[in-house]
Amino acid sequence: MIKLNAKKIGLICLASALLVQLVTAVSLLSYSYRTKAYAEKNGRIINLACLAYDPYSPFKGRYIRLSFEEETISSKNLDKESFQNPKKHGEHYYFRMEEGADSLWTVRGIRKDLPKKESEQAGENAKGQAKSIYIKGKTYPYMLYASASETIHATFPFSEYYMQENYARYVDTIKWEDFNALKPVLSLYVDKNGQCIQKGLTVLSGSQRVSIEEYCKEKIKGVKAQ
């Protein structure tokens, strides 16, 4: 029988933990690559208008916390199919998104289940992009046969946007109202199951829309030049 001392056992446990982390990281990278490729090939990239999450402390650590206009939904803008099933508090649902003339996407329907056929999920518009795309999220609070005057609250799992440390520190110096005045937009890759991966966060810089990273880079460069 092979006897292992405490040091060897510790090394084995450490190696096992590192292996699990490595496998997890590779799996996530593989999923991200496949989702990006699928979304680009099938025109499944959407843009959501967003704001700083907390007017007093909108940024924390190395990420920007965001809220989205589409988290507050007027039921009068939803299709009839949205109200066929009782909606329970905090459960996952699929939100049918449509693109507007401003290239921003809005919620036009809510489903308990994702349509089984991809052809039922989305057709194509003149640009070759999907007319409707479903994304996964939750509804708060109850949404049981809401009337047209009611507001539905939703939450989505992509509200934290991570940044490099130096950019995050600069963003932390921006007042929330000034940040929101930049009209931030979060772009997402969407897979066929409604799961989303962040493509990037953009803001207005003059009349041009640029990535938040590029915006911070130029602002930091300007401060250093003074």
Predicted regions and their residues:
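Structured domain cores in non-transmembrane regions
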Residues: 72-145
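Hydrophobic membrane-insertion alpha-helices, especially the h-region
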Residues: 11-31
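Short extracytoplasmic
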Residues: 45-78
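N-terminal positive-inside, membrane-proximal cytosolic segments immediately preceding the first
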Residues: 1-13
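Extracytoplasmic/periplasmic terminal helices and flexible tails
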Residues: 106-109, 127-226
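Short nucleic-acid-contacting surface segments enriched for D/E, G, S/T with interspersed K/R
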Residues: 59, 82-93, 173-185
